[in-house]
Amino acid sequence: VYKRQVFVNAPVELPAQLLNEETIALAQLHGQEDENYIRQLKTMTDQILIKAFSIKTEADIKKAVRSEADYILLDQGAGGTGETFDWSLVPAIKRPWFLAGGLGCENLESAIHLLHPWAVDLSSSVETDGHKDPDKILEAVYAVRNIKEEI
Protein backbone atom coordinates (compact mmCIF):
# COMPACT_ATOMS: atom_id res chain seq x y z
CA VAL A 1 0.00 0.00 0.00
CA TYR A 2 1.42 3.34 -1.08
CA LYS A 3 0.50 6.76 0.20
CA ARG A 4 -1.03 8.62 -2.71
CA GLN A 5 -2.98 11.75 -3.37
CA VAL A 6 -5.60 12.41 -6.00
CA PHE A 7 -5.14 15.70 -7.85
CA VAL A 8 -7.72 17.42 -10.04
CA ASN A 9 -6.29 20.19 -12.23
CA ALA A 10 -3.70 21.17 -9.60
CA PRO A 11 -0.77 23.42 -10.52
CA VAL A 12 2.02 21.07 -11.64
CA GLU A 13 4.26 22.31 -8.84
CA LEU A 14 1.98 20.89 -6.13
CA PRO A 15 2.21 17.17 -6.95
CA ALA A 16 5.91 17.62 -7.77
CA GLN A 17 6.58 19.13 -4.35
CA LEU A 18 4.63 16.49 -2.42
CA LEU A 19 6.28 13.68 -4.39
CA ASN A 20 9.80 15.08 -4.03
CA GLU A 21 9.36 15.68 -0.30
CA GLU A 22 8.13 12.06 -0.06
CA THR A 23 4.91 13.24 1.57
CA ILE A 24 3.26 10.93 -0.96
CA ALA A 25 4.67 8.02 -2.98
CA LEU A 26 2.56 8.54 -6.06
CA ALA A 27 0.26 11.07 -7.65
CA GLN A 28 -3.08 10.13 -9.18
CA LEU A 29 -4.23 12.71 -11.73
CA HIS A 30 -8.01 12.87 -12.18
CA GLY A 31 -8.56 16.18 -13.93
CA GLN A 32 -7.93 17.59 -17.38
CA GLU A 33 -4.16 17.12 -17.12
CA ASP A 34 -2.89 16.58 -20.65
CA GLU A 35 0.30 14.96 -21.95
CA ASN A 36 2.18 18.28 -21.74
CA TYR A 37 1.31 18.45 -18.03
CA ILE A 38 2.47 14.86 -17.53
CA ARG A 39 5.74 15.48 -19.41
CA GLN A 40 6.39 18.62 -17.37
CA LEU A 41 5.67 16.81 -14.10
CA LYS A 42 7.98 13.95 -15.12
CA THR A 43 10.82 16.47 -15.56
CA MET A 44 10.20 17.69 -12.00
CA THR A 45 10.06 14.28 -10.27
CA ASP A 46 10.92 10.66 -10.87
CA GLN A 47 8.08 9.36 -8.70
CA ILE A 48 5.08 7.38 -9.92
CA LEU A 49 2.30 9.09 -11.87
CA ILE A 50 -1.10 7.55 -12.51
CA LYS A 51 -3.41 9.28 -14.99
CA ALA A 52 -7.14 8.56 -14.84
CA PHE A 53 -9.16 8.44 -18.04
CA SER A 54 -12.92 8.58 -18.37
CA ILE A 55 -13.88 5.79 -20.76
CA LYS A 56 -16.86 6.34 -23.04
CA THR A 57 -15.49 5.24 -26.44
CA GLU A 58 -12.69 3.21 -28.02
CA ALA A 59 -10.94 6.52 -28.76
CA ASP A 60 -10.74 7.14 -25.00
CA ILE A 61 -8.98 3.77 -24.59
CA LYS A 62 -6.49 4.59 -27.37
CA LYS A 63 -5.74 7.97 -25.79
CA ALA A 64 -5.16 6.33 -22.41
CA VAL A 65 -2.83 3.66 -23.79
CA ARG A 66 -0.66 6.35 -25.46
CA SER A 67 -0.25 8.30 -22.21
CA GLU A 68 3.25 8.95 -20.89
CA ALA A 69 2.05 8.44 -17.30
CA ASP A 70 3.62 5.47 -15.53
CA TYR A 71 0.20 3.87 -15.13
CA ILE A 72 -3.22 4.53 -16.57
CA LEU A 73 -6.49 4.20 -14.68
CA LEU A 74 -9.63 3.46 -16.65
CA ASP A 75 -12.79 4.77 -15.00
CA GLN A 76 -16.37 5.50 -15.95
CA GLY A 77 -15.98 9.20 -15.28
CA ALA A 78 -17.98 10.64 -12.42
CA GLY A 79 -16.48 9.22 -9.24
CA GLY A 80 -18.40 7.52 -6.47
CA THR A 81 -21.47 6.61 -8.51
CA GLY A 82 -21.03 2.85 -8.25
CA GLU A 83 -21.38 2.62 -12.05
CA THR A 84 -19.02 0.72 -14.33
CA PHE A 85 -18.10 1.77 -17.86
CA ASP A 86 -18.64 -0.49 -20.88
CA TRP A 87 -15.98 -3.14 -20.28
CA SER A 88 -16.41 -4.46 -23.83
CA LEU A 89 -14.43 -1.40 -24.98
CA VAL A 90 -11.28 -2.67 -23.26
CA PRO A 91 -8.94 -4.63 -25.52
CA ALA A 92 -5.96 -6.61 -24.27
CA ILE A 93 -3.83 -3.77 -22.90
CA LYS A 94 -0.10 -4.47 -22.94
CA ARG A 95 0.90 -1.99 -20.23
CA PRO A 96 0.12 -1.99 -16.50
CA TRP A 97 -3.27 -0.40 -15.91
CA PHE A 98 -5.78 0.12 -13.13
CA LEU A 99 -9.49 -0.62 -13.37
CA ALA A 100 -11.85 1.67 -11.46
CA GLY A 101 -15.48 2.63 -11.42
CA GLY A 102 -18.28 0.68 -9.83
CA LEU A 103 -16.07 -2.09 -8.48
CA GLY A 104 -17.05 -3.98 -5.37
CA CYS A 105 -16.85 -7.48 -3.93
CA GLU A 106 -19.83 -8.53 -6.05
CA ASN A 107 -18.10 -7.87 -9.41
CA LEU A 108 -14.36 -7.96 -8.67
CA GLU A 109 -13.95 -11.57 -9.73
CA SER A 110 -15.65 -11.13 -13.09
CA ALA A 111 -13.80 -7.86 -13.75
CA ILE A 112 -10.39 -9.38 -13.04
CA HIS A 113 -11.05 -12.58 -15.01
CA LEU A 114 -12.49 -10.70 -17.98
CA LEU A 115 -10.14 -7.71 -18.20
CA HIS A 116 -6.89 -8.74 -16.48
CA PRO A 117 -6.06 -5.32 -15.00
CA TRP A 118 -2.73 -4.89 -13.25
CA ALA A 119 -4.57 -3.35 -10.27
CA VAL A 120 -8.05 -2.35 -9.16
CA ASP A 121 -9.05 0.92 -7.54
CA LEU A 122 -11.92 0.75 -5.07
CA SER A 123 -13.54 3.78 -3.53
CA SER A 124 -17.20 4.17 -2.64
CA SER A 125 -17.79 0.40 -2.53
CA VAL A 126 -15.55 0.15 0.54
CA GLU A 127 -17.19 3.05 2.36
CA THR A 128 -19.97 3.31 4.90
CA ASP A 129 -21.60 6.70 5.38
CA GLY A 130 -18.89 8.36 3.27
CA HIS A 131 -15.94 6.96 5.25
CA LYS A 132 -13.62 4.06 4.49
CA ASP A 133 -14.93 0.96 6.25
CA PRO A 134 -12.14 -1.36 7.49
CA ASP A 135 -14.41 -4.43 7.28
CA LYS A 136 -15.36 -3.70 3.67
CA ILE A 137 -11.71 -3.05 2.78
CA LEU A 138 -10.66 -6.39 4.29
CA GLU A 139 -13.47 -8.17 2.45
CA ALA A 140 -12.27 -6.66 -0.84
CA VAL A 141 -8.62 -7.54 -0.12
CA TYR A 142 -9.56 -11.14 0.64
CA ALA A 143 -11.66 -11.30 -2.53
CA VAL A 144 -8.74 -10.09 -4.66
CA ARG A 145 -6.30 -12.48 -2.98
CA ASN A 146 -8.63 -15.41 -3.63
CA ILE A 147 -8.91 -14.41 -7.28
CA LYS A 148 -5.11 -14.12 -7.60
CA GLU A 149 -4.72 -17.64 -6.20
CA GLU A 150 -7.09 -18.98 -8.87
CA ILE A 151 -5.20 -17.34 -11.73
Each model region followed by its residue ranges:
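Short, small-residue-biased leader/transition segments that mark boundaries at the very start
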Residues: V1-Y2
